[in-house]
Amino acid sequence: MSELQTVRKKIHGNFFLEKTYKEGKLFYEVLRYKDDYIGINYGYLEDELREETYINDNRIGMVIVNEKDKIYICTLDEKRHEVGITVTYHNKSGRLAHEIDYLDDICMATNRVYKDGFIKNVPLIKSLEKRENIDKKYYKKYYEFKHKKNILRVEKIYCKKTRKRVDFKAYKNNKLYGFREVRDDNGNIILRGSHLNNKKIGIWHEYENHKVKIKVAFDENEKFTGIYREFFSNGDVKEEKYYFQGEEIKSKEK
């Protein structure tokens, strides 16, 4: 077995940037407050990059697993239950490969499979789906599931001119719940992240020209937490900051 080597860099007070190496390569990195993980945790595995968030030392919010061929995205609530929309995208084309809808960790629909850009095997969804005009520019398609006293509503908004999806989200009892994705009128990705109880929580990615520009995490009060990174177009880190409860943690080192 390969030995892991962990290096801790003090940022300020009880805040440390912790990096773990395996065979000389970066394997894991996270910001720590005392012994607790905070914000985005990066796991650099052999064939994938895994991103997840810890708040109060509990894994919560959007989880992203970026593999060679596909990107898997889900949302965990405070009980670590999978909630809202879980998606898998083809890495090369960016097309949606698979969608599963969860309400309180219960799978409500598994037949959201896409092949070559077309929906396949979706009789349940087709029978539930409704269409509604929003204004002259946009319309939405939506469907709902009920479980006990809770209602899951999955909603997709489209541009009438381009017919591209511009918003993809879910609600639990009329409050934003789980994964959300926002695109421009031409279908270019702008934002990805998660909500719980109508609030941003966990990892959010901001995009520019199809590439990640900013990675940041929000705590339960929608304040920045953990490692904040802004990137150049080639993927190199342009700026790195550290946050806790919305306040920047400034290193004493120059």
Language-model-detected regions and their locations in the chain:
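Glycine/tyrosine- and acidic-biased, solvent-exposed loop/turn segments at the edges of beta-strands
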Residues: 1-254
